[in-house]
Amino acid sequence: MSNEYKIKPEDIKDLINPMGYCYASDTITIDGLPVGYMHREKSEDEEDSGWRFYSGTETEEYVEDEHHFMMFDLNYLANCDPTIIPYLKSKKGIELERVEGTDKFREIKE
């Protein structure tokens, strides 16, 4: 796997107001897959948006390897997959999965 990011810094557009950073899987930021699952947890610090993004293709072993995840400005993820934008102001604790074949997400309720 190459460590070249999907979007070069000079190609990033301001799609959202600053909201802090997030963590995202390399399957999105390097491999270019769309977001398939996202959740918002309690922030680690003042700059942490709480958002965590996955393509949904990651295995348990993949997720357990911290080297497969990086911290990004939330706007970078919005550039990678703009379909997440309508959901970014959702409350902490929410879990969302993509409705297969669409640009929409639905809340996962336990």
Task: Label each PLM-derived region with a short phrase.
Residues 19-47, 51:
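Amphipathic, interaction-prone secondary-structure segments
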Residues 70-110:
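Short, compact, well-ordered microdomains
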Residues 2-23:
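Negatively charged, low-complexity tracts enriched in Asp/Glu with abundant Ser/Thr
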Residues 5, 21, 53, 69-72, ...:
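Phenylalanine-focused residue identity feature
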Residues 15-18, 25-31, 82-89:
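Short, solvent-exposed secondary-structure boundary motifs
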Residues 38-87:
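Acidic, aromatic-enriched beta-alpha/helix-loop junctions
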